């Protein structure tokens, strides 16, 4: 089985990622802080260039495209429960990204999301990108 998940990440520019948690009342799955050291590398490569607040959908073991859609819906449903707060974040930073991650190179980049999901992405000024999932939380 291929392991799929949706990662929501918000670039908080020069603010610490904790500000998102304070506004939306949800702790991130992970946060990256500008200037944080990446083990084993020497500066300047060791420095993150952006601050990010990241939330990962529950893992899906998908054998069909429908489960990929569900991973987006997991994240969007979480956001909808705090809609006003996430819209405020979207306006503040204008950089909310939804990243579909896959453990294999079979990620269908032409995958089409349902209209209602696309509408919700638009509401949050969201962008969708695809990548290979190379780490385990």
Language model features: what each stretch is:
Residues 1-137:
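Acidic (Asp/Glu-rich) sequence patches and key acidic residues
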């Amino acid at each position: 089985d291929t392991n799929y998940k949706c990662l929501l990440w918000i670039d908080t520019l020069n603010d610490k990622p904790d500000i998102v948690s304070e506004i939306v009342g949800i702790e991130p799955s992970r946060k990256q802080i500008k200037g944080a050291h990446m083990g084993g590398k020497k500066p300047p490569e060791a420095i993150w260039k952006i601050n990010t607040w990241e939330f990962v959908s529950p893992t899906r073991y998908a054998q069909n495209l429908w489960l990929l859609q569900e991973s987006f819906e997991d994240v969007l449903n979480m956001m909808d429960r705090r809609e006003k707060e996430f819209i405020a974040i979207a306006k503040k930073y204008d950089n909310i990204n939804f990243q579909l991650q896959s453990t294999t190179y079979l990620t269908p980049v032409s995958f089409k999301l349902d209209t209602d999901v696309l509408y919700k992405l638009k509401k949050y000024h969201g962008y969708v990108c695809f990548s290979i999932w190379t780490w385990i939380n």
